[in-house]
Design a protein with these regions (language model features):
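Short, Lys/Arg-rich, polar N-terminal cytosolic tail immediately upstream
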Residues: 1-7
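Membrane-proximal helix-loop-helix interfaces that form the catalytic/acceptor-binding platform
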Residues: 10-367, 377-521
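Membrane interface segments of multi-pass transport proteins and intramembrane proteases
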Residues: 369-371
Length: 524
């Protein structure tokens, strides 16, 4: 970093190039992967249509759809309701996340610059923009990138408060926390320990006025924003069979050893943030373990040696965030009791910032040490970190260029249309109906008569039906005049309804066989 400072490169150039890189990575193949189930669910919860939405839901208002088919607070849908009034297309819908991601990147740059320096901030933006799982959510129309964006700016305000306490900053922090929790329930794992930590900090610093103001603002926020969120959204959403708020299953502890389970959970979260579900992840899990313990060791080292109170406070905050998250998730209260998935994305911005700061502070501590051998190691450490980050960026860029299409209903609908599928009875299963309806109704050839032969299944319970139950369901609810000789089935796999029809003599042809399926079943 010392060599870079000597170059006297203007900040607008270094930062500008990093931001341009973000835009390149974010816009690259933005709509290459089709919009899938969750994005379409968000879409139909964000359009102010009155009345049932054919093939999607019988709920007649935007509020009912958010309260009974969603699993999140309403802020994202409110924003998308406005965004989609400007334009309604697949690209524009996804582009909203790119814009939020850019605001997140600006916040990240400012946070890292504040804690480290502008060159570390620049490198952080490059790395941030090359992480596959992050760019996946930048290219997905969902609340997750909004959550990341808001949490980064929450950290930025948190650092300003630790630097200098003011009543205005304390109140702004409370407001931002409310916005966070109205974006995603997982934000509570961050804002609760952070808010309590600041409350203690106000008291210990002798800022009694700020303490009481903050405490009152917390109470007002809890009553004025928390109770409505609980009553109008959390409680109705908890009745959803696929709700993430509570799981009816035994508590699982790895090896019946709580210590092992704790570190295993840490590893799963770190691995997911670094690699997502890479097919080679199992082969290099040992590498993740090494990285995990190296980071833990460096974190302890930095906490003991650094003179920056902001860094020490942020490390303590991260410890409390994960401890609370670990306990709640292990008890199956959150995220089905699983670690290492999108429901822990609230941890991503905190850990990213923490890792960047730990690496930077480690180099600075070695550089400022009285021991010559530590000073001599400093340039090699800096070069090693930069090379490691560039190699990681290369891996991330490779993953991003091979963006995975979760559920390719775009191909299913276009093939179905090309094969005159509207003339054949078509059964769309529960999890595929959102995206099927989206691509059907956004097709340039769409007309109301397309619905004449389509049945979209809105009954979740049918997923576990036996062959006999399926046939009974089809005959009673879908085809009361008798099963047709030809049926298209839109599914995500060779599922139970296909098996049931095959059991009574239908022969199956896989017309589309990708991450979504279009089966043609015919009686012979």
């Amino acid at each position: 970093m010392k060599a870079l400072n000597k170059l006297k490169v203007p900040e607008w150039i270094t930062a500008g190039l990093a931001f341009i890189y973000y835009w390149i990575m974010a816009l690259y193949k933005l709509t290459n992967a089709p919009i899938w189930q969750d994005e379409c669910m968000e879409y139909y919860c964000s359009i102010p249509v009155k009345g049932a939405i054919r093939g999607v839901t019988q709920y007649t208002t935007m509020y009912e759809r958010m309260a009974y088919i969603q699993q999140q607070p309403p802020l994202y849908n409110w924003l998308m309701c406005i965004w989609l009034q400007i334009h309604d297309s697949e690209w524009w819908y996804r582009f909203s996340s790119v814009v939020m991601g850019f605001i997140a990147v600006i916040g990240l740059y400012l946070v890292i610059k504040k804690l480290c320096d502008r060159f570390t901030a620049t490198l952080s933006v490059y790395v941030f923009s090359s992480i596959y799982i992050l760019m996946y959510y930048v290219k997905e129309a969902s609340e997750y990138i909004l959550l990341i964006m808001l949490l980064i700016w929450t950290v930025y305000l948190y650092l300003f408060i630790v630097e200098k306490i003011t009543v205005k900053r304390a109140v702004l922090f409370t407001i931002l926390c409310v916005v966070d929790i109205y974006t995603h329930y997982g934000a509570v794992f961050v804002i609760v320990p952070m808010a309590l930590q600041l409350l203690v900090y106000y008291w210990r610093s002798g800022e009694k006025k700020t303490f009481w103001t903050a405490l009152v603002s917390y109470i007002i926020a809890g009553v004025g924003a928390g109770i409505p969120l609980l009553y109008f959204y959390m409680l109705p959403q908890s009745t959803n069979p696929i709700s993430t708020l509570g799981a009816d299953k035994p508590i699982e502890i790895t090896g019946n050893n709580i210590i092992l389970d704790f570190f295993d959970s840490l590893m799963w979260v770190l691995r997911w943030c670094m690699l997502d579900y890479d097919r080679d992840a199992e082969k290099i899990t040992w590498t993740i373990w090494i990285i995990l313990f190296a980071l833990l060791g460096l974190g302890i080292f930095v906490y003991r040696k650094t003179h920056k109170k902001e860094v020490r406070a942020f490390i303590r905050c991260n410890i409390w965030v994960f401890l609370i998250y670990y306990v709640i998730t292990t008890l199956n209260i959150y995220a089905y009791g699983w670690f290492g998935n999108r429901y822990n994305l609230f941890i991503f911005p905190l850990w990213f910032i923490l890792i960047a700061v730990i690496l930077y502070e480690t180099v600075q501590i070695f550089k400022e040490s009285d021991r010559q051998w530590m000073q001599k190691l400093t340039p090699f450490m800096s070069i090693g970190i930069v090379i490691a980050m560039l190699l990681y960026c290369t891996y991330g860029d490779y993953r991003i260029s091979n963006h995975w299409a979760k559920s390719d209903l775009r191909t299913v609908v276009s093939t179905w249309r090309a094969d005159d599928g509207e003339e054949v009875p078509t059964f769309v299963n529960f999890h595929q109906r959102y995206a099927f309806v989206y691509y059907l109704t956004h097709s340039k050839d769409y007309q109301e008569s397309d619905w004449n032969q389509i049945y979209c299944n809105e009954t979740l319970e049918t997923l576990g039906y036996s062959n006999e139950e399926w046939i009974e369901f089809l005959e009673a609810n879908v085809y009361p005049d008798g099963l047709p000789t030809q049926i298209y089935v839109v599914s995500g796999q060779h599922d139970t309804v296909v098996g049931a029809l095959e059991s009574i003599g239908y022969q199956t042809t896989a017309v589309v066989d990708t991450t979504a399926k279009l089966f043609l079943l015919e009686q012979k």
